[in-house]
A protein has these predicted regions:
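Transmembrane-helix motifs of polytopic, lipid-linked glycan transferases
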Residues: 98-115, 364-366, 433
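Transmembrane signal-anchor helices characteristic of membrane glycosylation enzymes that use polyprenol
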Residues: 7-43, 246-260, 389-392, 467, ...
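Contiguous transmembrane helix-bundle modules in multi-pass membrane proteins
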Residues: 125, 140-150, 162-163, 184-196, ...
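Active-site-proximal, structured, solvent-exposed surfaces of multi-pass membrane proteins
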Residues: 366, 668, 720-852
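Extracytoplasmic/lumenal acceptor-recognition loop(s) of multi-pass membrane glycoenzymes
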Residues: 45-77, 81, 297, 309, ...
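Transmembrane-helix signature of polytopic, membrane-embedded enzymes
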Residues: 111-130, 173-186
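Membrane-interface coil-to-helix junctions
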Residues: 15-104, 126-138, 142-150, 282-360, ...
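Polar, glycine-rich mid-to-C-terminal structural blocks
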Residues: 206, 236-296
């Protein structure tokens, strides 16, 4: 027992050393310069500042991006969840080392749950955790995705442990309920916690892929029981019921995130547009073309085994001393070639661009194929099924019949994009089955004849393919990319030579790894004699060591010292520019800024200081996305053309055209240069304005079209879902969109105080008046009241703004964002998390009592 504990302790220490040794920069305080995290810092700055200063009044809304939006996908809701602190404890440490360590530990438990001996299980954990995709997403800043992937093997391990505890009787053996039930209950409790934490990472798409693996496991288990062990069906249902009930508690503990996310998603790009497209009614879900834009090509699948089969990354590194491209650029006198060599356009596959391949490891792929021919257990089938599903989903538009079936008929699938991500399923299934068969070989589970047949077939497929790549690369493509079209031919030729060289290098590497693995297995299977058991173990450990060397070496291409910076360097991108300082002198509590020095709708850095017209989010409100496509982008292009020839700021302001939709969003400043004064948009409508009429649309298509013809200063455009709203004015007839008395007489409304979740206005009106606010309408959570508590109904105006009808007099109007779903979901989280903790304690106590 002590020896066993020492082995496990040694492996854990090894994992800690590996995680921090792979990213030693974190020990000196450096962080990964993650583009997505810098974007997050910009978009969440207002929210984080407010919450830090007002811990008892946390905001669920931010005005910092896209005119305003819920913070559901930024900071979320953590109220009520008693398991949150336990979750945070697991992530203690310096990231990304803490992420890698969490993944290593979970994958190790997963391998152990399959019965793999510890030393080989450690090799399998490395194969899982150092797949190139993990390191790529760490490098770009997809931290939530990485944490979700790190928790995934914990969930699988707990589920497998639960079923094995209930069903592991040997043929003819019959354990009593006291022998199997406590361990089964404990496994279900661990499953609930692992599932709770995996969902808490907040990446539903990864959780969806986890569900595919789990369902495959359960279905195959049912078939196996029906064919082989019908007597155990009762225990299966007990284990399943425990997993279901406790799993629901784990899910329920996350209700404070899941329910607001579900409510918000209905209003976003994931919920679909109200507009008709190509004659079809508005669909609910992402557009299929958008969802499948990043589809893995059939021709890319070999890079599961040969990393640079399609060039690797769109901005990949080469050896400057050996690169034909760098040599050419040096001959032409280009400077700074050391930096250029780190970001050449090497990828030549079908995706728009990529951070790198989904490299699973040449050894892992070889072992997986070996297992398909050699392994006879049920595990082969429940691991093969999700593998095939993952490949089919990742192919996206290259395999449209399969993609359309999932998109139109499988629940929630049409909410996801970047379908190539489905290959993460293989990060688990390939190492699981591969190291399962390796463990059986080490345990002397196969005779030489069976191994020879399956081994030679697997070696021919992997090693033979790699050899063919080395000898005849021209068989596998032109090595030209679509992005090469705008380059000079001599440069394209140099890039092609580099791509072929990288292709051959990695094919040769994979050939060597597969050959070494095959040779070690052949050596392990030599005729039995004294010491043959040790020989098999040495071979297994040597193969695990090769996996470690290969996966970390390839991984360094995607996460290395060049990607780390000091905290000061990272923060420098958020220093105030002269133009920011000029804008921030404005004492008005709220106005919006259009920053043309960045990609307006794909960059959230301006949100750090300003209420930004643009930003970045794949889950922005759908109506705002419609506004971008129909009006904001055309108006921005018109603005750029109008001021393009101006020599001074005043000339640019004089040339500034009237931009009705940007103006209704209260876009007061336009940034053209970091170091110059901003343009002032004299047409901005302000924070709120009275209107005296309405134009009404019968459909959503008519509603958005009317924005282009109405005088938005004088009338409100109302959609069909607000047809009952009465605007206190004379009716607007025909095409006369502007009432004669649109401006009103002496009435005024002014924003007096701004907070992200509360707005205060003072107004004076001689009669009931309709008002439009330059604030984004959201159907759930915003309320408006007068100073005496009288509620005021809000409606949607001008496609995406808020409107209200105010009573006559001098009043204060308060708008506040307090979504009911936050209170309800926090209560559910509180109940479920408390029950989960109590049941876990009871399950642990029961197990030890039975043992005693």
């Amino acid at each position: 027992m002590k020896k066993s504990l020492l082995v496990y302790a040694g492996i854990v220490v090894f994992f800690v050393a590996l995680a921090y040794g792979f990213t030693p920069q974190v020990l000196s305080g450096k962080i990964v310069n993650q583009s997505d995290i810098s974007g997050y810092v910009g978009m969440a700055h207002e929210t984080n500042q407010w919450n830090a200063a007002h811990p008892d009044d946390r905001t669920a809304w931010t005005g910092s991006m896209f005119g305003g939006m819920p913070t559901t996908m930024l900071t979320g809701n953590t109220e009520g969840d008693w398991t949150q602190k336990i979750y945070d404890l697991f992530l203690t440490g310096r990231r990304p080392a803490s992420y890698l360590l969490l993944s290593l530990l979970g994958a190790f438990l997963l391998m152990l749950s399959l019965g793999i001996r510890p030393l080989l299980a450690a090799g399998g954990a490395v194969a899982v955790s150092f797949c190139s995709y993990n390191l790529q997403i760490i490098q770009v800043g997809h931290n939530a995705k990485m944490v979700a992937l790190a928790w995934l093997p914990w969930v699988l391990a707990a589920a497998i442990y639960t079923y094995r505890s209930a069903l592991s009787d040997a043929p003819g053996e019959k354990r009593g309920i006291r022998q199997w039930l406590p361990r089964t209950v404990l496994g279900a409790a661990l499953f609930a916690f692992a599932l709770d934490f995996q969902i808490k990472a907040n990446h539903v798409q990864i959780s969806y892929y986890l569900a595919i693996i789990l369902f495959s496991y359960v279905i195959v288990l049912i078939v196996w029981l029906a064919l082989r062990r019908r007597a155990l069906f009762g225990r299966f249902f007990v284990a399943s019921a425990l997993l279901l009930v406790l799993g629901l508690l784990g899910i329920g503990a996350n209700a404070n995130r899941l329910l607001p996310t579900y409510e918000y998603t209905q209003q976003t790009m994931r919920g679909g547009s109200d507009l008709t497209r190509d004659g079809d009614s508005g669909s609910k879900g992402l557009d299929l073309d958008y969802a499948t834009a990043w589809s893995y090509g059939w021709e890319e699948l070999p890079n599961l085994m040969i990393p640079d089969f399609n060039g690797g990354a769109s901005a990949g590194a080469v050896n400057p001393d050996k690169s034909a491209t760098i040599r050419l650029l040096r001959d032409y006198g280009q400077q700074n070639l050391a930096q250029t060599a780190k970001a050449l356009p090497l990828y030549w596959g079908p995706q728009p661009f990529t951070a790198g391949p989904m490299y699973m490891g040449a050894i892992t792929v070889f072992l997986f194929l070996l297992a398909l021919g050699l392994y006879r257990g049920k595990e082969k089938w429940w691991l093969l099924i999700p593998t095939l599903i993952g490949v089919g989903l990742a192919l996206g538009y290259h395999f449209m019949p399969f993609t359309r079936f999932w998109y139109y008929y499988m629940p929630f699938y049409n909410k996801f994009r970047t379908v190539s991500m489905a290959l993460v399923i293989l990060q688990y299934t390939l190492p699981m089955l591969g190291f399962l068969v390796l463990d059986r070989i080490v345990r002397d589970g196969y005779d030489r004849k069976a191994f020879r047949k399956a081994g030679l077939a697997a070696f021919a497929l992997t090693g033979g393919f790699s050899l063919l790549c080395c000898l005849a690369p021209g068989l596998f493509g032109t090595f030209s990319a679509a992005s090469d079209a705008g380059m000079q031919e001599v440069l394209v030729d140099a890039l092609v030579r580099d791509r072929i060289a990288l292709f051959r290098r990695d094919a040769l590497m994979s050939l060597g790894l597969v050959a070494a693995t095959f040779a070690l297995l052949w050596w392990a299977g030599l005729p039995k004699k004294e010491g043959s058991a040790d020989r098999r173990l040495y071979a297994g450990v040597a193969i695990s060591a090769l996996v470690l060397i290969n996966m970390t070496a390839v991984g360094k291409r995607y996460l290395n010292a060049d990607h780390f910076v000091s905290q000061r360097q990272f923060d420098s991108q958020f220093r105030e520019r002269p133009v920011d300082q000029a804008i921030l002198q404005d004492s008005d509590p709220s106005y919006r800024v259009l920053d043309l020095t960045v990609n307006v709708f794909n960059d959230s850095h301006p949100s750090y200081f300003h209420k930004n017209i643009g930003g970045y989010s794949p889950v922005k409100l759908q109506r705002y996305q419609d506004l971008i496509e129909q009006y904001l982008s055309p108006e921005i292009n018109a603005l750029a053309r109008a001021v393009g020839g101006a020599r001074t700021v005043s000339e640019a302001e004089d040339a500034l055209p009237e931009l009705p939709v940007l103006s209704m969003l209260n876009t007061r400043y336009v940034v053209l240069d970091d170091n110059a004064a901003p343009l002032v948009n004299r047409y901005a409508l302000g924070n709120a304005w009275f209107v005296d009429g309405a134009v009404r649309a019968g459909t959503a298509d008519e509603e958005i079209a009317l924005l282009g013809g109405a005088d938005l200063r004088g009338v409100a455009v109302l959609g069909p879902d607000f047809a009952s709203v009465e605007i206190p004015s004379r009716p607007v007839a025909g095409a006369d969109l502007v009432p004669e008395d649109a401006a009103g007489s002496g009435d005024e409304i002014v924003l007096t105080d701004y907070a992200p979740n509360a707005l205060r206005y003072r107004y004076s009106a001689g009669a009931p008046r309709a008002v439009v606010f330059s604030e984004i309408y959201y159907p759930s959570g915003w309320t408006a009241t007068l100073e005496d508590g009288t509620p005021v109904d809000l409606f949607r105006a001008d496609w995406t703004l808020r409107g209200a009808v105010l009573p006559a007099g001098d009043h204060e109007l308060v708008m506040r964002f307090d979504p009911p779903v936050y209170r309800v979901s926090s209560s559910i989280s509180r109940v479920c998390s408390i029950l989960l903790i109590l049941l876990a304690l009871l399950a642990t106590g029961a197990k030890f009592l039975v043992r005693a």
